[in-house]
């Protein structure tokens, strides 16, 4: 391991694992899960302030390929909720996304690696606008297909490790047409009609990750420094 902390931890685990002997086969699937929560606020002089919060959960499994021990593939189910409050009048936008994706990663010769992910999502969007006390609501459905492809190389040095890479993100989103409805009286003067939308996206990211390890022999400490530099081009 190039990371000294991980190497030290693995050594400790091996020494304490005398009575446990579990050998895994290539047919074994390894389950995993993760969750996330995000909170934020955006204030602007020229537009309404925005408070947003989101949360999500992912459950997946992956396995090492039978015919290639340097490759792994898997799948993941995801649920995400994004909620944005706009201004102080009650206008808000809430999106529920249900996703399924397949992914694959492979370590190649000379520390080259490739990652790929392809997925689909179902979107359920609830919109609420408040105009001079008139409350307008609407529900919109959508479908999405997306893919991400990453190519990189691990450059190992005694003092500094570099990971230059190139990533391509592609997406296609289709949103159904809908019309707002009022919940106050019968006034539809402010109601908007949204036509069907087809949105294409393409991003190219050039970047480099770097990490450096320092040892303090007197204190028996290992300090890791991490950094990232990226350039993102929107080709949409």
Model-derived regions: residue spans:
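Interface/linker segment at the passenger-translocator junction
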Residues: 1-43
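Membrane translocator/pore-forming domains, dominated by Gram-negative outer-membrane beta-barrels
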Residues: 25-236
């Amino acid at each position: 391991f190039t990371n000294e902390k991980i190497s030290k931890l693995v050594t400790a685990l091996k020494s304490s694992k005398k009575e446990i002997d579990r050998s895994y086969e290539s047919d074994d699937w390894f389950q995993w899960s993760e969750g996330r929560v995000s909170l934020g606020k955006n204030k602007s002089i020229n537009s309404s302030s925005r408070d947003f919060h989101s949360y999500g959960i992912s459950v997946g499994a992956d396995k090492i390929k039978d015919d290639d021990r340097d490759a792994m593939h898997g799948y993941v189910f995801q649920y995400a909720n994004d909620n944005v409050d706009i201004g102080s009048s009650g206008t808000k936008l809430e999106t529920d996304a249900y996703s399924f994706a397949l992914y694959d990663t492979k370590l190649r010769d000379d520390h080259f690696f490739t990652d790929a992910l392809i997925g689909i999502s179902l979107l359920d969007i609830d919109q609420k606008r408040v105009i001079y006390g008139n409350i307008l609501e609407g529900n919109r459905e959508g479908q999405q297909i997306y893919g991400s492809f990453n190519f990189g190389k691990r450059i190992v040095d005694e003092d500094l490790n570099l990971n230059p890479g190139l990533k391509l993100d592609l997406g296609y989103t289709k949103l159904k047409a809908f019309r707002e409805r009022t919940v106050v009286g019968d006034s539809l003067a402010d109601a908007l009609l949204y036509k069907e939308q087809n949105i294409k996206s393409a991003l190219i990211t050039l970047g480099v990750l770097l990490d450096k390890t320092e040892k303090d022999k007197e204190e028996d400490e290992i300090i890791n420094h991490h950094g990232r530099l990226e350039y993102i081009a929107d080709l949409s």
